[in-house]
Amino acid sequence: LQDGMLLFGEVGLVGEVRAVSQAERRVTEAIKTGYTVCVLPESNRASIEKAGNLDTQKIKLIGVRHVRELLDCVGL
């Protein structure tokens, strides 16, 4: 992983990346801790951006739907 990158989500049996609870809270804590990139389930990313409660200038949110996309994001 690159420095400052955080990953979270639930991975299903066929590789789908599922939403998790309290995603906005997790991203808020990541910002406070100095993370600059967050790879998370696409549905969580969309919900966070729609709510508009976070300063997305401080962290780049990358939504993924499948492990293949996740691996591309981290360069594997």
Residue ranges of model-derived segments:
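Peripheral, non-AAA+ core regions of ATP-driven protein-machinery
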Residues: 1-76
